[in-house]
């Protein structure tokens, strides 16, 4: 499952028409506009005249602009947005248009909204209050989004809210809570925060793992693909609890939008008790943060430089959380931006 946004609308879906797709594009497509139009035509061929297919621009996390396509059916006036930018990159790398469109059909069929989830249910607060969750985003980079969405400030970040439509081990489908929806519900931001905190902790259980434990999971997930020498090399790496630079990964069991574990009840306090003092918080991405015990040899400036270098070279633009580093002061139960 991709990380899908949902939109309103109405259309019909003839889900058993996949065999009717005919992709017929000679030559090379050079622009996203032409590519998106070709995909749109293919989806209309698959789902028939009663289907409504739309292509639109979407502003994602950190102000990233993407091109999305929605396929709407009459059974639900909502539809997932499937982003085309990655597919266009694949096309330019040689992937065929037919192969791409077949995958888009598969993605839609897996993620389409079921009959029991509709816009009417979203606007009824009682129907969605147990699905309201939160996540952390960069406040400055999401200024445009925050103009039209309730949020709570946290350091240089913002806590925003969403309705969880579905989730599995490959992703989530969600609806961002906008100001108009909040006003329709007749609730305040504090109420949203309290509900979201309870729901997020319940639906996305948090965990803090040492690097040794993370490496063990990686080995376990890919053991068949690694030979004995590679496995030994992993465990010879000097990055664990007994190293001079121990690091711990804090996220949730789904490893999705896990940076908000910082807001979970007791997480920071319990970790401080475990290590016996203060620790740095490194915003690895929107999906996880790193905890690094503070000691006299630790240089905050080095950590900040490291975070900024990793963000610039290793983290996807829409997954960057912050270029800053924070410290948790155990004696004051207080987080400070360095």
What do these predicted ranges mean?
Residues 245-257:
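Short glycine-/aliphatic-rich beta-strand segments at the starts of folded cytosolic domains
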Residues 253, 261-338:
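C-terminal structured domains
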Residues 2-9, 17-60:
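N-terminal alpha-helical "arm" segments
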Residues 57-248:
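Charged, alpha-helical interface segments at or near domain boundaries
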Residues 31-32, 44, 99, 103, ...:
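Basic, alpha-helical nucleic-acid-binding regions used in initiation and control of genome expression
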Residues 1-18, 223-236:
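Glycine- and charge-rich intrinsically disordered segments
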Residues 27, 31-39, 92, 96, ...:
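Short amphipathic alpha-helical segments
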């Amino acid at each position: 499952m991709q990380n899908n946004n949902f939109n309103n609308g109405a259309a019909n879906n003839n889900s058993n028409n996949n065999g009717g797709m005919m992709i017929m594009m000679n030559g090379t497509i050079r622009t996203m506009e032409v590519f998106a139009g070709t995909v749109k035509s293919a989806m209309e061929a698959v789902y028939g005249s009663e289907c409504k297919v739309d292509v639109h621009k979407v502003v994602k996390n950190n102000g990233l602009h993407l091109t999305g396509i929605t396929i709407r059916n009459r059974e639900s006036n909502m539809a997932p947005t499937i982003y085309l930018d990655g597919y266009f990159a694949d096309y330019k790398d040689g992937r065929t248009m037919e192969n791409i469109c077949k995958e888009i059909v598969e993605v839609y069929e897996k993620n389409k909204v079921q009959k029991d989830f509709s816009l009417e249910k979203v606007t009824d607060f009682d129907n969605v209050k147990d699905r309201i969750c939160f996540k952390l985003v960069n406040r400055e980079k999401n200024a445009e989004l925050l103009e039209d969405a309730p949020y709570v400030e946290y350091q240089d970040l913002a806590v925003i809210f969403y309705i969880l439509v579905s989730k599995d081990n490959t992703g989530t489908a969600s609806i961002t809570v906008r100001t108009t929806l909040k006003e329709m519900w007749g609730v305040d931001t504090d109420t949203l925060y309290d509900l979201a905190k309870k729901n997020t902790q319940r639906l996305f259980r948090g965990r803090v793992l040492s690097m040794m434990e993370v490496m063990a999971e990686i080995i376990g997930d890919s053991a068949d693909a690694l030979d004995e020498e590679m496995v030994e090399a992993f465990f010879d790496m000097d990055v664990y609890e007994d190293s001079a630079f121990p690091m711990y990964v804090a996220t949730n069991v789904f490893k999705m939008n896990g940076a908000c574990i910082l807001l979970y009840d007791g997480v920071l306090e319990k970790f401080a008790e475990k290590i016996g003092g203060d620790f740095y918080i490194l915003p690895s991405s929107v999906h996880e943060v790193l905890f690094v015990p503070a000691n006299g040899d630790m240089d905050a400036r080095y950590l900040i430089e490291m975070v900024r270098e990793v963000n610039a070279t290793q983290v996807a633009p829409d997954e960057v959380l912050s270029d800053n580093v924070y410290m948790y002061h155990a004696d004051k139960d207080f987080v400070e931006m360095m």
